[in-house]
């Protein structure tokens, strides 16, 4: 049950701050931005990502290693339901749809994540997952961050990528999984930290 205080101006600002954390997570993981990943968690946070359970530094090491063979990653979030337990703690349930393209060389990471299933041999595979982030948020020092995350997996599927799949024109702005992505160039161009 919600109270009228759940929608006060202060609470609306809290909801917006928590939602921004979710969006920053998506950008950081999709661009493999280690500082961005670290920035959404409290230093003592615990993440339960299924095959990985541990602290923030170990999560970053696990993601960096696992994503080495993933040239494309896109996390889309929706249905962000935020419930406040206290003035400085909240529970957020966020629906997620993630598409990750595993290169033929990166399939060992896919097999480790899917119990041995990794798509057809010799071809890239797109993994599509539907899940929910169940995040315990805490405001410390005036900043909302994740204190504990559990990823609840709901469904998934895989599709092999055809060898003749369309390629983008190299002159276009094309997404990258590093600080050379167009978003970081635009951030720097207007004076935001890259």
Language-model segments: what does each one mean?
Residues 34-115:
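A solvent-exposed, acidic/Ser-Thr-rich amphipathic alpha-helical stretch
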């Amino acid at each position: 049950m919600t109270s009228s205080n759940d929608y006060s101006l202060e609470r609306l600002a809290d909801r917006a701050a928590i939602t921004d954390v979710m969006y920053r997570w998506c950008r950081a993981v999709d661009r493999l931005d280690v500082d961005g990943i670290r920035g959404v968690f409290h230093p003592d946070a615990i993440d339960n990502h299924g095959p990985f359970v541990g602290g923030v530094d170990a999560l970053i090491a696990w993601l960096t290693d696992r994503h080495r063979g993933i040239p494309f990653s896109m996390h889309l979030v929706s249905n962000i339901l935020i419930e406040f337990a206290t003035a400085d703690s909240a529970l957020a349930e966020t629906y997620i749809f993630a598409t990750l393209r595993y290169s033929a060389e990166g399939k060992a990471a896919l097999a480790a994540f899917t119990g041995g299933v990794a798509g057809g041999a010799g071809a890239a595979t797109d993994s599509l997952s539907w899940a929910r982030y169940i995040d315990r948020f805490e405001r410390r020092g005036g900043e909302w961050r994740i204190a504990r995350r559990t990823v609840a997996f709901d469904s998934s599927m895989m599709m092999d990528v055809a060898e003749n799949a369309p390629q983008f024109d190299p002159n276009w702005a094309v997404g990258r999984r590093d600080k050379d992505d167009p978003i970081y160039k635009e951030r720097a161009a207007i004076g935001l930290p890259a």
